[in-house]
Design a protein with these regions (language model features):
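Pore-loop/selectivity-filter region of tetrameric P-loop cation channels
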Residues: 370-388, 415-475, 479
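Juxtamembrane/interface segments at transmembrane-helix termini
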Residues: 404-420, 483-490
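Bacterial N-terminal signal peptides
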Residues: 2-14
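Selective detector of the "anchor" transmembrane alpha-helix that sits immediately C-terminal
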Residues: 388-410, 473-479
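Short, well-ordered alpha-helical packing segments
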Residues: 336-339, 469, 485
Length: 490
């Protein structure tokens, strides 16, 4: 065991040394007194078919291996070096490994339409001017670990058949991956972007943007994520659009931070869209989206943030009503879809709250007419069928107010019955004014049964008030039973 403990650090260091892109030191750590090699000598050596193996050199002049050149069949390894002139290798096929790790490119670099049949290694490189990899074909793994692009760069229409690793890479200016195809896995873990575009890009395998930072505009419009995608803990400083994109697997946006509007209009999530603990400082636009299941547990919204669910089709939308109640862009169909969603989740109280707000906003926006008057009655009497307390209040209020009226207005008399004489017998004698308790008892009897107690009766105009209370009693009691049944029986 002691021997194993001593050997373990050595074995780990050797294993890390074999990871692509991690075995080359930073260019800054190398000596500045590097030998100078002319670009023409490099071209001549490539033409001779001899393998190239240089480290810590300076390549002077323009290195131009243009179209029409036969496939480069030998391996090329130029690491931790500096290219002072332009590097132009267009429509060139590299049959063996191309290893340019740790190099600094002081001028423009172009690998347009190149084919890399084996590994293409650009880890820890620094492109000070434009870098163009448009229409490039990577048949093997492509590693850009900790690579820095200080100017505009392009990977448009590029195809990555092997793993594409942009771990810890930095893009200090515009970069586009428009129409690119990632047929295996892709990693942009902890990458830093300014303006970036993945328009109509295809990710056939798993891809991660975990902890990536998007400081400029980020465009993922019409992008196809055919497998799982990870944006966990990513941060978007400016506008981000995923409009018309499709997600075929798990879409993990947990702990993400959108500081501006997050546009997901027209997207399609075929699997779980996980946004737990996300933060939205701007609006969340899901208009026209198709969601299989979207989870928004513990999300945080800015005070001015809005959520647009217009024309959104979702099977399961997991977010508590208290989180979004003041942020919904009003749309009747969206509200009713949320009500149905909450009922499917068996969150019945939240379904009631959502429906109540839907009706209240509709009432505020409706023009005056019989329809609005009917809505007002429905609101005040039973809270649109989801507020039992409203109906209970009106029952108690009606009993109390009529009791006060009968008592204060002396609207009822009471008989004192001597012996066991029947009502209407001559020995029945009217008594003095009834007490408030008797008036309240009389009001309860009229409200619940429309019949006065045997020893009391209304007088004068109060007969009509007693009849009106009986009618209101039947109305409110019937309404109470209906609303209570709807709330208790789900």
């Amino acid at each position: 065991m002691l021997l194993l403990a001593l050997l373990l650090p050595i074995l780990l260091s050797e294993a890390l040394a074999e990871v692509p892109g991690l075995d080359s030191p930073s260019p800054a750590s190398r000596s500045q007194a590097a030998p100078v090699i002319a670009a023409q000598d490099i071209l001549a050596q490539i033409g001779s078919g001899e393998p190239l193996n240089y480290d810590n050199v300076t390549v002077a002049g323009q290195l131009d291996l243009g179209p029409g050149v036969l496939p480069v069949k030998q391996s090329i390894r130029i690491t931790n070096s500096r290219f002072q002139g332009p590097l132009r290798m267009e429509a060139v096929t590299f049959a063996e490994i191309l290893d340019l790790r740790g190099c600094v490119y002081e001028d423009d670099v172009s690998f347009v339409k190149c084919v890399f049949q084996k590994d293409a290694k650009f880890s820890r490189a620094r492109f000070q001017k434009q870098a163009d990899f448009a229409e490039t074909y990577f048949q093997g793994p492509a590693s850009f670990i900790s690579t820095l692009f200080q100017n505009d760069s392009s990977f448009s229409n590029a195809q990555f058949n092997g793993d594409a690793v942009f771990l810890d890479s930095g893009f200090a200016s515009d970069v586009d991956f428009n129409y690119a195809r990632f047929l295996s896995s892709g990693s942009f873990w902890n990458a830093n972007f300014e303006d970036v575009s993945f328009f109509e890009t295809r990710f056939a395998g798993q891809v991660t943007f975990r902890a990536a930072k998007f400081r400029g505009n980020a465009t993922f419009a019409a992008t196809r994520f055919e497998s799982d995608v990870l944006f966990r803990a990513a941060r978007f400083w400016r506008g981000s659009t995923f409009g018309l994109s499709s997600f075929g697997g798990l879409a993990d946006f947990g702990n993400i931070n959108f500081q501006k509007t997050a546009f997901f209009g027209g997207v399609k999530f075929a699997d779980l869209a996980y946004f737990a603990n996300a933060r939205f400082d701007g609006d969340l636009i899901l208009e026209g989206a198709r969601l299989y299941s979207m989870q928004l547990d513990n999300v945080t919204f800015n005070e001015s943030s809005k959520i647009n669910l217009n024309s959104t089709d979702f099977s399961k939308f997991v977010v508590h009503w208290s989180t979004i109640r003041d942020r919904m862009v009003y749309n009747g169909a969206a509200y009713l879809a949320l009500v149905k969603n909450y009922k499917n989740l068996e969150w019945f109280d939240e379904a009631d709250e959502c429906y109540y707000q839907y009706r209240r906003i509709g009432l505020d926006q409706a023009p005056w007419g019989w329809g609005k008057i009917s809505d007002i009655i429905s609101w005040l009497s039973c809270g649109y069928g989801v507020r039992v307390s409203y109906t209970a209040f009106w029952c108690l209020f009606t009993i109390l107010i009529f009791g006060v009226i009968f008592w204060a207005g002396k609207g009822m008399n009471k008989f004192e019955i001597e012996g066991v004489e029947l009502p209407g017998y001559q020995r029945l004698k009217p008594s003095k004014r009834v007490s408030f308790t008797d008036a309240l008892y009389f009001s309860i009897a009229m409200f619940t049964t429309s019949q006065a107690p045997v020893n009391t009766y209304p007088v004068g105009v109060y007969k009509h008030l007693a009849m009106a209370e009986g009618i209101l009693g039947w109305f409110f009691l019937g309404l109470f039973v209906v609303v209570l049944s709807a709330v208790l029986i789900r």
